[in-house]
Amino acid sequence: MMEDEDFLLALRLQEQFDQETPAAGWPDEDCPSSKRRRVDPSGGLDVIPFTQPRAERPLSIVDESWETLDPNPDVRAMFLQFNDKFFWGKLSGVEVKWSPRMTLCAGVCSYEGRGGLCSIRLSEPLLKLRPRKDLVQTLLHEMIHALLFVTQNNRDRDGHGPEFCKHMNRINQASGTNITIYHSFHDEVDVYRQHWWRCNGPCQNRRPFFGYVKRAMNRPPSARDPWWADHQRSCGGTYTKIKEPENYGKTGKSDKQRDKMPATEMPKKSKPPSSTSSSGSQDIRNIIPFSGRGFVLGGNAQIPTNKQIQSPPKAPPEPLHSPPDSPLLPRLQLNEDNLKRLSSGTSNIPRKRSVGNTNAFINVNGSPVRISNGNGSGGKQRSVRDLFQAIVLKSPDRGASAVGSSKSSTDASTADYRSNSALDAKPSGKTSLITDHLSYTISGPKTLSAESNISKYFGGSAKTDVQDSKLKTFGSPQKSAIGTPGYVSKAFGSNQRPDSTSSGIRNTGSPQRSHASATSGSSFKHFRGPAKPESNFPSPRNIGSPRTSGTTPSGAKKRSWEEHNSERVFDYFQRTVGESATSTDKKREEVRSEAPPPVRDQQANNPPAQITVHCPVCHIRLPESTINDHLDSCLL
């Protein structure tokens, strides 16, 4: 008995397994065990053939049971499912959204050309009143339009031609839907058309509209409608509004009346904004009152005198003094005027000029270039020089020390030179006149007496030769009077042209005008170029060497033989200086009075100043002529 029960249990388990296996997808024809022995409960082992029932067909996408299973479907999820199932995944870039204002049609598919955006809009007001089946069919309808747009197969004139019908029939057969060309729920469309107009002309008796115009928006018929011109030709009547939603006009009037009511006539029930809200937060104006000055629009902006808030008097600011360890800077006292000037200066911060300002920028090949101010640097330099001169002259200690040091160095050098031969003493008047004239034409008259003594010799301070470095050496002890070839060449025409030197000598009023100009040219030649072997005058290489008389110390015994071979130049200087020694003061006055014309001549002969601009990319100052090449290399 136990064996029979085990055998029967095994048969039942096998039968259950065979029933579950075909349901997984195996066909009955391929499975030889489709016929199983069924055990008779009476004990007989007769084989009873039977067939396995086929699996039921899955629910259609428009089945009625979906109304309860998924009453609020996700439109985007449905779109992705239908795209993979019916459209081969070609609509992945299409957008699907609800439209809350579209009430004329159920759905719209818009396409912006090749490579543009394809968008599907579904009417939320219409489809929320329809069953789920209409939503699915409307979505599939618009997806067919999107497929024709994306695949560039939209050759149908009205959009619902053979290509559209081909895909429509294919999906209807595969899914059991009933996709049509036009939707059939017109009643829902009419529900939202609550603004009616009717024409009083002949068209009120014509089909199909009988003169009615129904719209969901309060937009009366006008020339903006495409059919307006045809209506004016065929009918010529005017439209009058005959219907609108309830309380539509009253709500608008109440809002307008509420806006026209003044603030004093507002109902007492309306609470001010400073009241405590329901959330528990309180307006800060209840804690900290407003202490400013308010203005009422349309009324008197004056505040009563009793309500004006009097600010406490301000204490006068204490004068601030500069620290005692800064003797160069003058002691400044900040009074009320200075404080006002400082406060106004902080408010008047220069704004950054726009590149569109044609007064500040110019267009150079499409790039903005700032227009530089040519007089800006000169004015700043003069103001700084004047400031330092005023500071040094005002400070007695620094001024006395600077003048004393310059005088002591000048006296020592003069004593050394007096102990030498007459070659150094006699031409000093001529060279002093020339050097004084050159220094005057460069930077104007001298301010210190030490400069006239230093200018007697060819190698004085750098101040006499290069006036641009005046700021660096002003107030410091003068350098030792050691003449170098560079200084001599600068004093005799390195930075000055020969014609300017000759013109300076010509203005002195000497009777030997032509001879003086020729002599200056010859001296310029001797001092610039190397000396020839037959020349008796020492070469620039020897000038400034220990063997020359101009730099020989007072304890030197004797000059070298090379210096004794220059009798001709010595005689020339002795003759010319002797003639002009009596009228030195008069010549200096004439040179100073007539000095400005050579300055103008020199400025006229000099080339114009080169305009520099800023690179808008790397902010480097460079000449204007090279800005284009620089921008090409900078923008790469």
Curated annotation (Swiss-Prot):
Motif position, Nuclear localization signal: 535-566
TM spans (from-to): none
EC number: 3.4.24.-
Protein residues bound to Zn(2+) 2: 615, 618, 630, 634
Motif (PIP-box): 451-458
A GO MF term: zinc ion binding
Active-site residues, record numbering mapped to chain: 142
One Pfam family per UniProt: SPRTN_ZBD
Motif placement: SHP-box: 290-298
Disruption outcome: Morpholino knockdown of the protein causes severe development defects and accumulation of DNA damage.
Regulation of protein activity: DNA-binding activates the protease activity: single-stranded DNA-binding specifically activates ability to cleave covalent DNA-protein cross-links (DPCs). In contrast, double-stranded DNA-binding specifically activates autocatalytic cleavage, and subsequent inactivation.
Annotated GO CC locations: chromatin; nucleus
Binding of Zn(2+) 1, residues: 141, 145, 160
Region Disordered, annotated ranges: 19-42, 238-382, 398-430, 473-608
Self-association state and partner proteins as the record states: Homodimer.
UniProt record similarity statement: Belongs to the Spartan family.
Name by which UniProt lists this protein: DNA-dependent metalloprotease SPRTN
Organism of this sequence: Danio rerio
Lineage: Eukaryota, Metazoa, Chordata, Craniata, Vertebrata
